[in-house]
């Protein structure tokens, strides 16, 4: 890697296009989806533990599933008309779609969903920025949240990983120290 080139430069990232296609100018990351076993448990976690709001709920009775869109938006600004509320929800950035297939919450045979962190590996985690990783983790500990990694565990100090009720991993880092955590790799 050339010293004058940043790690983000096209010279250091074969395949990276520098001219963004005009047709994609309005695109943005809107959501990621988790399949959940029990909406009562997951909604409690994402709202009470992580502080998200329910932006929109969509039910599909014919197909027996519901979608719960969670995010950090101020819902007092959301339209009350159901169609307008859906349009508003899909205009928000970085939301989580919780998908519940009806009946899984009471099915004793249901084993849960694969979170991507065991073989075969795939999806890994989502990331949440917090004001202070240590204070957030102390709160999560008091709430009984399961940890994958606490802030001082392992080689990367100051970041943590928790699990949601379905075993999906959530990385936690704070905006004040994330630059220091990744400094040697920047």
Swiss-Prot record:
UniProt entry tagged with the keyword Transferase: no
Organism of origin: Cicer arietinum
CDD domains: GlxI_Zn (cd07233)
PANTHER family assigned to the protein according to its UniProt record, in alphabetical order: LACTOYLGLUTATHIONE LYASE (PTHR10374:SF30), LACTOYLGLUTATHIONE LYASE GLYOXALASE I (PTHR10374)
Cofactor(s) required for function per UniProt: Zn(2+)
InterPro entries on file: Glyas_Bleomycin-R_OHBP_Dase, Glyas_Fos-R_dOase_dom, Glyoxalase_1, Glyoxalase_1_CS, VOC
Keywords: Lyase, Metal-binding, Zinc
Top EC class, one word: lyase
Note accompanying the cofactor annotation: Binds 1 zinc ion per subunit.
E.C. number(s) listed in UniProt: 4.4.1.5
Catalytic reaction annotation: (R)-S-lactoylglutathione = methylglyoxal + glutathione
Database matches in Gene3D superfamilies: 2,3-Dihydroxybiphenyl 1,2-Dioxygenase, domain 1
Sequence positions that bind Zn(2+): 31, 97, 125, 171
NCBIfam families assigned: glyox_I
Function: Catalyzes the conversion of hemimercaptal, formed from methylglyoxal and glutathione, to S-lactoylglutathione.
Residues that bind substrate: 31, 35, 101, 121, 125, 155-156
Domain spans labelled VOC: 28-175
Active site: 171
Protein name, per record: Lactoylglutathione lyase
């Amino acid at each position: 890697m050339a010293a004058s080139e940043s790690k983000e430069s096209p010279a250091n990232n074969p395949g990276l296009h520098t001219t963004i296609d005009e047709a994609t100018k309005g695109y943005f990351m809107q959501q990621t989806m988790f399949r959940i076993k029990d909406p009562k448990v997951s909604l409690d976690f994402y709202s009470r533990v992580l502080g998200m709001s329910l932006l929109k709920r969509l039910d599909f009775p014919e197909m027996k599933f519901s979608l719960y869109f969670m995010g950090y938006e101020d819902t007092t600004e959301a339209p009350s008309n159901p169609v307008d509320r859906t349009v508003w929800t899909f205009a928000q950035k970085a939301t989580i779609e919780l998908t519940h297939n009806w009946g899984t919450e009471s099915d004793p045979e249901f084993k849960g969903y694969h979170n991507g962190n065991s073989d075969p590996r795939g999806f890994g985690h989502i990331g949440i920025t917090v004001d202070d990783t240590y204070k957030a983790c102390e709160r999560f500990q008091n709430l009984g949240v399961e940890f994958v990694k606490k802030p001082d565990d392992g080689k990367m100090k100051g970041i943590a990983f928790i699990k949601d009720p379905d075993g999906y991993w959530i990385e936690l880092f704070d905006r004040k120290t994330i630059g220091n955590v990744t400094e040697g790799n920047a």
